[in-house]
Amino acid sequence: MAKKSLIVKQQRKPKYRTRAYNRCKLCGRPHAYMRKFGICRLCFRDLAYKGQIPGVRKASW
């Protein structure tokens, strides 16, 4: 989990556009963010494993 203070700080509009960054909508993690889903890789993995993301399957070849 991310610090609550950092999540609140990120929600404010930054003074400069380059300071804006993406955070996971579920846990607030700033790294390994997937734009298409709006969540980090860890949350993506958990949700995909539970079958809560439609159209996502585990790769097997």
From Swiss-Prot:
The UniProt record lists the keyword Cytoplasm: no
Q: Which GO terms describe its cellular component?
A: cytoplasm; small ribosomal subunit
Family annotation (Pfam families): Ribosomal_S14
- PROSITE patterns from the entry? RIBOSOMAL_S14
Q: What InterPro entries does the record tag this protein with? A: Ribosomal_uS14, Ribosomal_uS14_bact, Ribosomal_uS14_CS, Ribosomal_uS14_sf
Q: Name one GO molecular function term.
A: zinc ion binding
In the record's cofactor note, how is the cofactor described as bound? Answer: Binds 1 zinc ion per subunit.
Q: Which Gene3D superfamilies match?
A: 30s Ribosomal Protein S14, Chain N (4.10.830.10)
User: Per the UniProt entry, what is one GO biological process?
Assistant: translation
User: Which cofactor is recorded for it?
Assistant: Zn(2+)
Protein origin, superkingdom: Bacteria
Q: Where on this chain does Zn(2+) bind?
A: 24, 27, 40, 43
Keyword vocabulary terms for this entry: Metal-binding, Ribonucleoprotein, Ribosomal protein, RNA-binding, rRNA-binding, Zinc
Q: What is this protein's function per UniProt? A: Binds 16S rRNA, required for the assembly of 30S particles and may also be responsible for determining the conformation of the 16S rRNA at the A site.
Q: How does it assemble?
A: Part of the 30S ribosomal subunit. Contacts proteins S3 and S10.
Q: Which NCBIfam families match?
A: PRK08061.1
Give the family this protein belongs to, as stated in its UniProt record: Belongs to the universal ribosomal protein uS14 family. Zinc-binding uS14 subfamily.
Q: What is this protein called?
A: Small ribosomal subunit protein uS14
Q: What is the lineage of its organism?
A: Bacteria, Bacillati, Bacillota, Clostridia, Eubacteriales
The gene from which this protein is expressed is: rpsZ
